[in-house]
Each structure stands twice: as C-alpha cells, then as structure tokens.
Amino acid sequence: MQLPKELKYAAIAGGVALFGLIFGWVLFPTILKSQLKKEMALSKKTDVRKMWEKIPFALDFKVYIFNFTNAEEVQKGATPILKEIGPYHFDEWKEKVEVEDHEEDDTITYKKRDVFYFNPEMSGPGLTGEEIVVIPHIFMLGMALTVARDKPAMLNMVGKAMNGIFDDPPDIFLRVKALDILFRGMIINCARTEFAPKATCTALKKEAVSGLVLEPNNQFRFSIFGTRNNTIDPHVITVKRGIKNVMDVGQVVAVDGKLEQTIWRDTCNEYQGTDGTVFPPFVPETERIQSFSTDLCRTFKPWYQKKTSYRGIKTNRYVANIGDFANDPELNCFCPKPDSCPPKGLMDLAPCMKAPMYASMPHFLDSDPELLTKVKGLNPDVTQHGIEIDYEPITGTPMVAKQRIQFNIQLLKTDKLDLFKDLSGDIVPLFWIDEGLALNKTFVNMLKHQLFIPKRVVGVLRWWVVSFGSLGAVIGIVFHFRDHIMRLAVSGDTKVSKVTPEEPEQKDISVIGQAQEPAKVNI
C-alpha cells in the first residue's frame, strides 16, 4: 500500500527535522569534541604542538623599577619614598629546545630558552634604559641576608669582604643605569687578594649564585635577568602530551627527573597543573585552571571571575594572587613551619631561587595592609596590578594573559655590620614585571575559521533544518487530513436530505381590538 502524496512529503520533512536534531545536537558536538581532542594534543602533526614549541610572536615583558628618592634618609632608618619608573618594554621570544617524545608514557621532555630585545618605542615616554636609578644594592643585601640567616657568626667577615668587593661603599644603595641592572650587568670585583674578599668570592663561585656570570680576570657580572637572556635553562621539564587523554595535555610530571620537589612541606612539593603554555579543553567555570611556575617553584590556581570576550570570541576570565599562607590550609605548606609564615601576600623565594627575596603582587595588591605603611608612593590597583587570564574554554586557549609579580627585599637591620645598623628592617619593593600575552589578529582569525565559524554555522543551520522540517511535516499532515475530511464530506456513502422550511401561518394583524379596562379591586 502506497502512502498518499501528502504523507510522503510529511515523512520526508519529518526525517529532515529528525536529522537536524540528531546531527545538530548529538553528532556534530561529538565529532567536534573528538576532533578537538586530536588537535589539542601535543602530537607532532598538530598546529598546537608547533606553537607550543615556539611561540610565533613576541610576548610583552615590561619592567617597572622603584627609584628610592630619599636614599640618604633611608640609610638612617627613614621611610622610603618611591617613584615608579617604567615600563621598560622588552619583546620576549620563547621557545622549547632539546624536545624529545616518549611514546611509552605519553610525555615530552624539553628545556626552555627565552630571548629579550629592548623596545624603546614601547617603553615609557623618554625612557632609553640609560637612566640612573637608585635602588637597594640587591647583591650586597643578598649576601648579608643569606649569611645572617644561615651563618650569622660570619657576618663580621662578610662586612670586611664587602668593603673590599664593593670598594668601601658609603651606603647600601646602588646607583646604576636601568639596562645595566636589568640585563647588561654590573661588575663585581673579585680580584682582591685580601682574605675576606677572596674567601667570599670563592664561596660565590661554588654556590652558583643566581644572576652572576664569571668574567675574565676574576670578575663577576651581576644582573637581574641577564643570565636568562638567550640562554638555555638547565632544568629538564617533563609534561604529558595528551594523546592518550587530552585532559592531561601539558601537565607537568617531573623536573630534572624528579617527580616532586623537596623545598617545601607536604603537598606544596607536588607538580600540579600544566607548564603554563597550554591548557586542557572543555574546562567548566566551576573548575580552576592550574599551572606550575618553574621560576617560582609553585602551582598557581586562578579562579573564575566573569565572562569576557576578545576579538569576538567568548572567553572566561580567571584571576589569581600570591595568597595568604598563614590562613589558607592549602598554602600553609609553603611556610617553613605551620606557625612561621610571611605576611599575607608575600612569598619567600629563598628556598626556590636561592636568593633572599619575596614575591608579591605589584604595589602590594591583596597583601597585608601593614606593608603599605612601610613605604610611600605605592597605589595598588587591581586593573593595573592584578594577575588575570582570559581563557577560551572549548579549546583551552589563553587569549589574553597578564602575569604580574613584584620582587621585594628586606632592609636587614643588624649591629654586626656598620652599613646595616640603622636600617629599618622592613620589606621594601625593588621592581615588578608584567609579562603579557595577547593573541594577534592572525591567530584569532585562524581559531575563528577552524572552530567558531563552523560551529556557529551549524548552530544556525540546525535550527533552520529542524524548524523547516517540522513545519513541512505539519503542513503535509494537515493537507492530508483536510483532503480526507473533504472526501468524506462529498462521498456517496453519506446521504444528505434537503430540508424545506415550513411556511408560517399567515395572521391578520391589521385590526387590533380595543383593550378592556381591567377590573377594579376593592381593598
């Protein structure tokens, strides 16, 4: 038995609607998710792997230096008055070298290399890098703080060594060109033959102090970032490729072959999160994204703040801070002892960097308010000084990221060193960095054309297909039953009798009789 023409059309239209439902809401998301799992893994065939190995554009690396405008008074214990100078803008190119795949456990090992180029056009107005800045002598203070902490009995000898190495300095301040202290380096004189300077310099060679480079004639060159520039980092990092499980992509497994650190307590020694250059896809808002910083030897866990967008792509904004080690049980293991923690918003970097410095948010944002009372000239502002990342949740792509960290040092107060006896003992800021990433138009368009435009087209088409298919099915059914009803109405099987209305009886109403007066009723 053949279906009527209208029902055939209705069946075809209904099939189209059903296809739209199945393809648009079931098959396409499944295909998309499967394809993304392949594309987001760090296999050699993917574009993500190429970008992961060598970011094809420069990051923004900005440095802001705090100039101490009243150094002479600070030497006598006064509150420092600071003036921020910056930004000194550098183009930072990042790549991974000595990359090796390990099929057996789905991991990759690599080392990092960063290259910095000073960009005066993008720096603050009129800044050339040749400006003289006045800051606490990081190297001198670092020596004193390290010895005071580890070998206080040797402070007297260190005092004599300082006089020889630094040529009898009048105070603990350094007056130096900005680019010299940041990258080019300043000379540390270790050519002295006196016992104290010679013994101290010998110890420096053995310790491999951060930021120190050995020069000819027994000299050292010291800078903050110089040893990082165009140098292969010695640490070997192992991360998951995500081929077997895409949710593991980029997860740090080991550093230098060790599955955990030994510098903190308990869970703070664990490697949690990715290496910060790639993240897993499909992360919901309720879940924190995690990244492990090899520079700071810790995991950061930004939390969701709000919905944002970047160049037409919807993103989720995540924010982070240093934390409160004393009152956050998850972070307390960063303290040497449970009841011995730095103030809120400070992290002791000595265990990680072998340098007696503290990390904080710029201008002591989200930190103990007491820190702001120890200096003048700071103005914390979350929009300028906060850590944030705008994250595309489907692909796990960081669209915009701003990592901002301030480095601080204690003005050591001790009677065993003449230069340090009148200092305040407070923690003061030295400089802060703003390392920024913003995907350029080329890569945003690539993401749009490969993912979001097809996704949007399918999103619109599925509604059109379902709507027109459903409408066609309804119309076909209506037409079928309408014709069926009409056929029944005119069919010979049903006889309809003609009804002739009865003519009403004609009455003569031309004469109306006179009405009689009603009878009277006596009451």
Curated annotation (Swiss-Prot):
<dbReference type="GO" id="GO:0005044">
    <property type="term" value="F:scavenger receptor activity"/>
</dbReference>
<keyword id="KW-0472">Membrane</keyword>
<dbReference type="InterPro" id="IPR002159">
    <property type="entry name" value="CD36_fam"/>
</dbReference>
<keyword id="KW-1003">Cell membrane</keyword>
<keyword id="KW-0325">Glycoprotein</keyword>
<feature type="glycosylation site" description="N-linked (GlcNAc...) asparagine">
    <location>
        <position position="229"/>
    </location>
</feature>
<feature type="topological domain" description="Cytoplasmic">
    <location>
        <begin position="480"/>
        <end position="523"/>
    </location>
</feature>
<keyword id="KW-0552">Olfaction</keyword>
<keyword id="KW-0716">Sensory transduction</keyword>
<keyword id="KW-0675">Receptor</keyword>
<dbReference type="GO" id="GO:0005186">
    <property type="term" value="F:pheromone activity"/>
</dbReference>
<feature type="topological domain" description="Extracellular">
    <location>
        <begin position="33"/>
        <end position="458"/>
    </location>
</feature>
<dbReference type="Pfam" id="PF01130">
    <property type="entry name" value="CD36"/>
</dbReference>
<feature type="disulfide bond">
    <location>
        <begin position="268"/>
        <end position="333"/>
    </location>
</feature>
<feature type="topological domain" description="Cytoplasmic">
    <location>
        <begin position="1"/>
        <end position="11"/>
    </location>
</feature>
<comment type="similarity">
    <text>Belongs to the CD36 family.</text>
</comment>
<keyword id="KW-1133">Transmembrane helix</keyword>
<feature type="transmembrane region" description="Helical">
    <location>
        <begin position="459"/>
        <end position="479"/>
    </location>
</feature>
<keyword id="KW-0588">Pheromone</keyword>
<dbReference type="GO" id="GO:0007608">
    <property type="term" value="P:sensory perception of smell"/>
</dbReference>
<protein>
    <recommendedName>
        <fullName>Sensory neuron membrane protein 1</fullName>
    </recommendedName>
</protein>
<feature type="transmembrane region" description="Helical">
    <location>
        <begin position="12"/>
        <end position="32"/>
    </location>
</feature>
<feature type="disulfide bond">
    <location>
        <begin position="335"/>
        <end position="341"/>
    </location>
</feature>
<feature type="disulfide bond">
    <location>
        <begin position="297"/>
        <end position="352"/>
    </location>
</feature>
<feature type="glycosylation site" description="N-linked (GlcNAc...) asparagine">
    <location>
        <position position="440"/>
    </location>
</feature>
<feature type="glycosylation site" description="N-linked (GlcNAc...) asparagine">
    <location>
        <position position="67"/>
    </location>
</feature>
<keyword id="KW-0812">Transmembrane</keyword>
<dbReference type="GO" id="GO:0005737">
    <property type="term" value="C:cytoplasm"/>
</dbReference>
<keyword id="KW-1015">Disulfide bond</keyword>
<dbReference type="GO" id="GO:0005886">
    <property type="term" value="C:plasma membrane"/>
</dbReference>
<comment type="function">
    <text>Plays an olfactory role that is not restricted to pheromone sensitivity.</text>
</comment>
